Amino acid sequence: MLSIQQNDLITQTGAGTPAGGLLRRYWQPAALVDELSGNRPIKPVRLLGEDLVIFRDERGRYGLIGRRCPHRGTDLAYGRLENGGLRCAFHGWLFDINGKCLETPAEPDDSNLCANIRQKSYPVVEKNGILFAHLGPGEPPALPHFDCFIAPNSHTFAFKGMIDCNWLQSLEVGIDPVHTSFLHRFFQDEDPSQAYGKLFRDTSRDSDMPMSRIMREFTRPRIEVEPTPFGFRLVTLRQISDRSTHVRVTNLMFPNAFIIPMSREMTITQWHVPIDDEKHYWYAIFTSFGAPVYKDEMRRQRLALYQLPDYIPNKNKNNDYGFDPHEQEHETYTGMGADINVHDQWACESMGAIQDRTTERLGTSDKAISAYRKLLREAIEKSGKGETPIMVLDPKQAASITGPAAIDGIGPAEDWQGYWQKSESSKRQAASWTNGN
């Protein structure tokens, strides 16, 4: 358990807070490219407690600036895109992607007011369907060469969803390899040929055993937490027989992302990004090591589950997450349908807006959560001292952080380490875009 002060330290992310200062040192997802794809590419964004507006100008450049016009505080999200920037609808003040004031049209011709005005702005980069922003001071760090960033656009798909609670409790679910045996338990296995775009519905690599069966029948895994330059690797072992072991390799990508295998050919890189301290978005890039991603199918599957424009889940606390007692008895462990995002959403939101960690009791199976909190506290302390925390990278360091491995397969019990490494290598050798690396 944590003290109130310890919990506040790692959950509060507004401007001026220790964790907020840390998270601002990294690139954070701010919006999907899809959200700015229409005729009016302007969207209000709340990120780390800051109210902002993201837009694409006529030249295709992205900008992220303060939402309130510095003139008299009106909402720039209702502005006009023209003349190289975003124009306030109140008095026509015009700002470019860097927050520079280009025009104050009601002022006298000889006025220098415009030259003295600078709207808050943050740099934006696009990576495979997600617009990332850097809200911290100084030069942004280099982005690591993760698979999700270097894969061609044809082999990736990006999506997001809102969760009505603090970011940390959702991130901790993502590095908890035991909950899948319970929270995501399906009493019947799906035909793998119908599993495209779904987590835990494919067969495990090098076997004909569905992932859902493995999670259901083997509920006491052995968990290895291995420190890495990017955070840590999680290796979860479920002994299937005297001769074979199920090996699942996942990763914590500091500060607020994880990478997991979705199927034999696809991985998910998922960030949990604070809107404020009591709600957040998950952002995900799905990366295929096989055929190009069927983006239309992936999008169709997910848009059926979310309400736009804010990506609010159709199943939520207001309708009891679709809970069905009959389904809970006969089909799923939760009775909340087949979408595992709903299961995770219920688990996280039911802890409260900000989980009270002063009353929790962690067990042996929570070792990754304990490891992450230690890493987070150390990084907060370093950042507070003006030192460079883990994963604030220069270009050379970023180029050295590749992959990482993310595998779900069944191999020989006596050499599970050799098995997953060979399996990962085989996956990469077969991919069209990895150059075998």
What kind of feature is each model-predicted range?
Residues 1, 15, 31-157, 222, ...:
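Rieske [2Fe-2S] iron-sulfur-binding domain
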Residues 1-27, 31:
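A boundary/linker detector
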Residues 2-4, 18-21, 100-109, 299-314:
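Short, charge-rich amphipathic segments
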Residues 15, 61, 138-437:
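C-terminal catalytic domain of Rieske-type non-heme iron oxygenases
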Residues 21-22, 27, 62, 101, ...:
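Tryptophan-centered short beta-strand motifs
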Residues 24, 118, 125-127, 266, ...:
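A short, structural micro-pattern
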